[in-house]
């Protein structure tokens, strides 16, 4: 008689007594058999579950109940098992010894376990399968030997395991298939040999496993298969050969007539032959992506009526769409990363049941009509070369829910291309060439992506998308129709609609509100009100508007607006006045005057930039969102940004040159040396202009973009390239201010005490010092802003940053000429000379007036000339032309006490 049956028969009296006796087994025998520190609980009326896991045990507990059906000894320190350690556990069905330190299991270790069905020995240190310990466990159904160090499987180790259904041998060190050991496992249904070091599968390796349904061989080193290696696997439905080193298509699968799921992705297979799956008509799913496939036979996937999923990723050499005749039940088709340039017009006739189509990362240029694919729910065509979407491309796809057309070259979409897609909720058209967007038939969209279409600058009304939840637009201004600003505006209008009505109307509205509130419950009223508010804020739109992407006004706040207008007016008028007095004056232009005139000219460009921004703000007042994208991408914004940076940098460079010129002039005058030629100064001015042009051209060359914001200025935050550019500008300007400070400090220190009054009373020296001080002070907040952004200091609000960029940065452009006009006497002299010259020019245009009294006119002319020319014993160094420089008998740096002199001959 079978020993297992004998054990059960011997235990029947005890079971009958427990079942019919008055005392409860839970309170009697069962609980008395629970080892110390273990957790025990009843398993039905007569059996016990014992959990002794993770207790640090080094040996098996000895006082186990005979009625134990489940014993968990995993995660302990058990290193060995003695023969017959659990002799009385005839009812034990599951034994867990995982996560211990077992290196060897002796014969008889599981003797007496007649009912054992599940044995877990994973995560130990076994180097081979126990030769005799597992034999004759006739009830065993599941055996786990994974995550050990097994490199050898004895031929007879599984003999007697007639009930074994599941065998885990994965994550070991096997180098070959243990063919002899598997011959006794005729009832085996699932086996995994994954994560080993198997190189080859010989013929008839699984010849006696006729009941095997699932076989996992992934993550090995298999490079070859015997042509008959799968013979005998008549019931196999799942075969996993993924992540191996196969070089050729596994033609041995043709004998697997019941195969339903096949995976051999991530190998080195380069071709799939014609009629590759002719012997596998039951295939439902095939995964063979991430293979360097160069050739696929056109008939490779024909006549697979049960195939539901076909996935081929990374087949970079496929140029033709496969012929899928007879594979009419395909539901999911993925062919990505290939070079397919066209689709057959009959693709939907072959695949009428297709639900998911993924042809991303191909070279498709033109699309056929998918109208026959009535069951399509998802289409992914991103990263192709599609140029146009015709009216019939997606016509009558009533089940289509997701359509991805991103990263193509789509420039034309027929107005009714999406008009017959009632189920469409997700549409991705990002990174195309769209300049317009059709809205017909898209009222059910919940997700819409249009980002990257830089030519799409028009606003899209939120009323056309009542169900929309997430939208991505090319420009932040287009989110104003969906954002908080617009919602708040609507709410404000609703609450303020009756502000101008009469008191009687207000009382009527209040009465109506309270009457409606009385007619229904107050809580329902409040809930409805909250839902209305949430509905207004339900759409998530990106990129979101903000201070640098405004919805209504380019210059938010009247403080900034008035500041920009003031700077524009003062910079234009004052710099124009200074430039006119310097360059149109009949008096001789000294080097320092030339520099002041050039500085005024470049400062005028800053005034032009501020004036243009103020004009754009006025033109788009209250509706900047309608024009924001046009302004950012227009030539005007880039020109204004270029002029702003050029003018700012030129002003700093020229001011540095002026400070150095003053220092050199004092040095040469003190040493009775000849000054540098006037032409050299002009060359240096030209070099400063070229350097400023170079700095201003960097954003146009890709370092950053002037059109990144409507302010047309590189912002001191955001992309690293933009931040680096701004920091470079600040460092360069700081270096210039340092040079100016050193030059003037050296000038002061090198003067004798008696010369101080003469030098510091000179108007031009003091004027440059004043410019140095004001410009340096105004440069500090800009420098602080740039460096704080560099180290991620976020305590500065965007409004403050905007004020600094629009008001503080261009402020020197209007202060520089004002300081010259108000505090420099040379301006008054030049202005008087200009007025006299203008007067003479005007009189010369009217000869009748000149002939009234010619004698008086001649006398006035001579008097004027004599008034301009003053002979003195002091020599003038810089206010005379080079040809009239006298000998330096009395060297003076500049005309500190005398006016500028010009020699004009008397008429």
Swiss-Prot record:
Alphabetically ordered keywords of this record: Cell membrane, Disulfide bond, G-protein coupled receptor, Glycoprotein, Golgi apparatus, Leucine-rich repeat, Membrane, Receptor, Repeat, Signal, Transducer, Transmembrane, Transmembrane helix
Location (main, coarse): membrane
Membrane topology: Multi-pass membrane protein
SMART domains from the UniProt entry: LRR_BAC, LRR_SD22, LRR_TYP, LRRNT
Cell location: Cell membrane; Golgi apparatus, trans-Golgi network membrane
Record bears the keyword Transmembrane helix: yes
Record-annotated disulphide pairs: 34-40, 38-52, 348-373, 479-541, 637-712
Any one GO MF annotation of this record: G protein-coupled receptor activity
Residues in the Extracellular compartment per record: 22-561, 615-638, 704-722, 789-802
Protein name, UniProt field: Leucine-rich repeat-containing G-protein coupled receptor 5
Organism: Homo sapiens (Human)
């Amino acid at each position: 008689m079978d020993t297992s049956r004998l054990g059960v028969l011997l235990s029947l009296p005890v079971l009958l007594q427990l079942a019919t006796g008055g005392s409860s087994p839970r309170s009697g025998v069962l609980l008395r058999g629970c080892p110390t520190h273990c957790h025990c609980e009843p398993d039905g009326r007569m059996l016990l579950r014992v959990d002794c896991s993770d207790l640090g045990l080094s040996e098996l507990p000895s006082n186990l109940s005979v009625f134990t059906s489940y014993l968990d000894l995993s995660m302990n320190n058990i290193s060995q098992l003695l023969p017959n350690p659990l002799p009385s556990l005839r009812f034990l069905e599951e034994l867990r010894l995982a996560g211990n330190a077992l290196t060897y299991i002796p014969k008889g270790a599981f003797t007496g376990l007649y009912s054992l069905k599940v044995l877990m020995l994973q995560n130990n240190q076994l180097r081979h399968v126990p030769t005799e310990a597992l034999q004759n466990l006739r009830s065993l159904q599941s055996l786990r030997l994974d995550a050990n160090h097994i490199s050898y499987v004895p031929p007879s180790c599984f003999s007697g395991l007639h009930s074994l259904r599941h065998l885990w041998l994965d994550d070991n060190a096997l180098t070959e298939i243990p063919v002899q050991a598997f011959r006794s496992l005729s009832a085996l249904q699932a086996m995994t040999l994954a994560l080993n070091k198997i190189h080859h599968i010989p013929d008839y390796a699984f010849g006696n496993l006729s009941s095997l349904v699932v076989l996992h061989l992934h993550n090995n080193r298999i490079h070859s298969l015997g042509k008959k290696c799968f013979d005998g696997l008549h019931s196999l439905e799942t075969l996993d050969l993924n992540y191996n080193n196969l070089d050729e298509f596994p033609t041995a699968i043709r004998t697997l007539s019941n195969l339903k799921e096949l995976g051999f992705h991530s190998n080195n297979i380069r071709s799939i032959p014609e009629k590759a799956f002719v012997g596998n008509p039951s295939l439902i799913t095939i995964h063979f992506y991430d293979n360097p496939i160069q050739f696929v036979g056109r008939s490779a996937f024909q006549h697979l009526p049960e195939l539901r999923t076909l996935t081929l990723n990374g087949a970079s050499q496929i140029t033709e769409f496969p012929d899928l005749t007879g594979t009419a039940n395909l539901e999911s088709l993925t062919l990505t990363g290939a070079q397919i340039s066209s689709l057959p017009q009959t693709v939907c006739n072959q695949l009428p049941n297709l639900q998911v189509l993924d042809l991303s990362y191909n070279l498709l240029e033109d699309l056929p009509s998918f109208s026959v694919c009535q069951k399509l729910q998802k289409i992914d065509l991103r990263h192709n070369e599609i140029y146009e979407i015709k009216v019939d491309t997606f016509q009558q796809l009533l089940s289509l829910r997701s359509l991805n057309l991103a990263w193509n070259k789509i420039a034309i979409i027929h107005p009714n291309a999406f008009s017959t897609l009632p189920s469409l909720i997700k549409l991705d058209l990002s990174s195309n060439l769209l300049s317009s967007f059709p809205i017909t038939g898209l009222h059910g969209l919940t997700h819409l992506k249009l980002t990257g279409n830089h030519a799409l600058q028009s606003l899209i009304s939120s009323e056309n998308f009542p169900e929309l939840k997430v939208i991505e637009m090319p420009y932040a201004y287009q989110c104003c129709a969906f954002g908080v600003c617009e919602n708040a505006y609507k709410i404000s209008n609703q609450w303020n609609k009756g502000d101008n009505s009469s008191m009687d109307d207000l009382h009527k509205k209040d009465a109506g509100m309270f009457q409606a509130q009385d007619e229904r419950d107050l809580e329902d009223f409040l809930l409805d009100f909250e839902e209305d508010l949430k509905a207004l804020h339900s759409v998530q739109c990106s990129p979101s508007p903000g201070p640098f992407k405004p919805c209504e006004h380019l210059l938010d706040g009247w403080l900034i607006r008035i500041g920009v207008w003031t700077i524009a007016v003062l910079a234009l008028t004052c710099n124009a006045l200074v430039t006119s007095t310097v360059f149109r004056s009949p008096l001789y232009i000294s080097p320092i005057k030339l520099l002041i005139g050039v500085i005024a000219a470049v400062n005028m460009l800053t005034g032009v930039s501020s004036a243009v921004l103020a004009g754009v703000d006025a033109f788009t007042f209250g509706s900047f969102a309608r024009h924001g994208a046009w302004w950012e991408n227009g030539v005007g914004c880039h020109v204004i940004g270029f002029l702003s940076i050029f003018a700012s940098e030129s002003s700093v460079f020229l001011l540095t040159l002026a400070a150095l010129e003053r220092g050199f002039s004092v040095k040469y005058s003190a040493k009775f040396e000849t000054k540098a030629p006037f032409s050299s100064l002009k060359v240096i001015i030209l070099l400063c202009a070229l350097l400023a042009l170079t700095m201003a051209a960097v954003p146009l060359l890709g370092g950053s973009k002037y059109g990144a914001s409507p302010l047309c200025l590189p912002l001191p935050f955001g992309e690293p390239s933009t931040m680096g550019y701004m920091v470079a500008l600040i460092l360069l300007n700081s270096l210039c201010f340092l040079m100016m400070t050193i030059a003037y400090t050296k000038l002061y220190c090198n003067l004798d005490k008696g010369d101080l009054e003469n030098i510091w009373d000179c108007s031009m020296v003091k004027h440059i010092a004043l410019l140095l001080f004001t410009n340096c002070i105004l440069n500090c907040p800009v420098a602080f802003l740039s460096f704080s952004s560099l180290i991620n200091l976020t305590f500065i609000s965007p409004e403050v940053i905007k004020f600094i960029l629009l008001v503080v940065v261009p402020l020197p452009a209007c202060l520089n000429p004002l300081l010259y006009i108000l505090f420099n006497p040379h301006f008054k002299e030049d202005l008087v000379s200009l007025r006299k010259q203008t007067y003479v020019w005007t009189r010369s245009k009217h000869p009748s007036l000149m002939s009234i009294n010619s004698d008086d006119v001649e006398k006035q002319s001579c008097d004027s000339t004599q008034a301009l020319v003053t002979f003195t014993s002091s020599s003038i160094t810089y206010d005379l032309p080079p040809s009239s420089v006298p000998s330096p008998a009395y060297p003076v740096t500049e005309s500190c006490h005398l006016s500028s002199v010009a020699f004009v001959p008397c008429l």
